[in-house]
Amino acid sequence: MTGKKSSREKRRKRSGQEAAAALAAPDLVPAVGGSGSGSTSGCGSASGCGSVTCCGNTSVSGSVTGGGSGGSCWGGSSVERGERRKRRSTDSSSSVSGSLQQEAKYLLPPLEKELFLAEHSDLEEGGLDLTVALKPVSFYISDKKEMLRQCFCIIGEKKLQKMLPDVLKNCSIEEIKRLCQEQLELLSEKKILKILEGDNGMDSEMEEEADDGSKMVSDVVNQQDSCVDSTSSLRENKQPEGLELKQGKGEDSDVLSINADAYDSDIEGPCNEEAAAPEVPENTVQSEAGQIDDLEKDIEKSVNEILGLAESSPKEPKAATLTVPPPEDVQPSAQQLELLELEMRARAIKALMKAGDIKKPA
């Protein structure tokens, strides 16, 4: 009995020492918590005793000192390592996603870097604010200066320098804007709209010239139509005037016919005399001089009669004078002028024909 008691006391002392050692080692405590709880078999293996009562007394210490508890400690450390790796991977993924733009700045070439920065900024290179509602360029067609400014904001200075030809590479932006403004002022709004729509400049010029030509042709046609209408209206107005003149001024036509007959007789008389005596040149000269004088007098008389300035002859009927009295201080009408011109032409033609007939036998 005394031997059993002494062995029990020794075991209790050992278990107390092991518990104190477990409390003294802080790194091993989380391993115990990570393993959940110690197994009774591990405690039995650590104590070297096969009895269950011994394991029940020192369940915590057995779990720490046993072989099984040692395996659980190693398993807990591996789990912690896995969790640390997961945390590192999540931290690295978040850091990669957060520093993607910074890494892209160093990895992309210069041109792609500019495009990347332009996409991730609210202000473009030329100063165009993307937060403001955009409007088409044709919206500013009434204000060409503002339209030019919007175009330069869209393009940007660096892009413009790349797009410029070699002739304008050395020009400043202000000078290029001034040149563009001068060229823009020369263009019409219609042509600017066609250029913005993508039409070729030559095609638009040809279309404008065709439009101008068609307008000119239409204007000429309208003028011709108006002239035709005016002439037709004049003719229609002249026809009743001619009838009135024929009806009301029968004495004028009679006088003209009488004068014409007298003129013809005057021309025929000297012609016959000249034909009868061709050998006498003096008579022919005198007859020609008298013919010219008679012609002038006859023309003056006919003009006065047509214009209504000559005195009415006593032989004219009174009814005619009553119906159409000779107007005084009245401008000649177009019909009267036409009649005068026709009579003078007819007499001139007759005179030329007679003169030709006189020269032939001579």
From Swiss-Prot:
The keyword Coiled coil applies. Residues 235-251 have a biased composition (Basic and acidic residues). Pfam families: CAAP1. Residues 1-14 have a biased composition (Basic residues). Residues 33-44, 65-74 have a biased composition (Gly residues). Residues 282-312 form a coiled coil. There is a cross-link at K105 (Glycyl lysine isopeptide (Lys-Gly) (interchain with G-Cter in SUMO2)). Anti-apoptotic protein that modulates a caspase-10 dependent mitochondrial caspase-3/9 feedback amplification loop. This is Caspase activity and apoptosis inhibitor 1.
